[in-house]
Amino acid sequence: MINFALLSLIHSADGKISTRAKTPAHFTSRLDLERLHDIRKQADAILVGRNTLEADQMTMTIPGLSPQEQPWRCVITEKGLLDPQHPFFQSAGGSRHIITSSIADLSSFPATIHQFDLAEWLSWLDHETQIETLLCEGGGELVKNLFQLNLVDTIHFTLASHSIFGGQKAPGITGLPGDYLPASRHYHLDILEEGAEGEFFLTYQKG
């Protein structure tokens, strides 16, 4: 049963999680990367969207932990378009899970395939597994969907005050500008720490 859903995101001084070209989120310090790994250790499963996986060339692993100690590595893809040579499929780590509502044949991939949309998969995760804490690392469209479902309990932000991306086509934490959420979501600032090189680490809790 899922007890907690977490977000871990980096955003620029103007609230953008990437540039308009969707460049990799590699603009923060080593201390921020260490913090990300510490946050991952809180999770039983990590979830990202396909575009984020591709842009950041993610393995979704935690250094120093055996594969048995690693959280599940989960990727959601609407069309089932994945590269079998991606580092995600070539690295040792937690079990791989692909979530897709597509009818694409993904049986050749070294992963468990879930023919669900996001809400269906989350329901399955909640009722059929022992996963208690789910961590989402983006992208913005996936984050917006979780906010729409009102499932986000904790938000970990890294504020990279040294960078400004600008532009309507640079995604914010809920993706590109679009429809409003069905209702406002309310959080309070729980932790604020100064990091390195003009970065600040913030943690928000629901309610």
Describe the predicted segments one by one.
Residues M1-G207:
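Enzymes that bind and transform nitrogen-containing heteroaromatic metabolites
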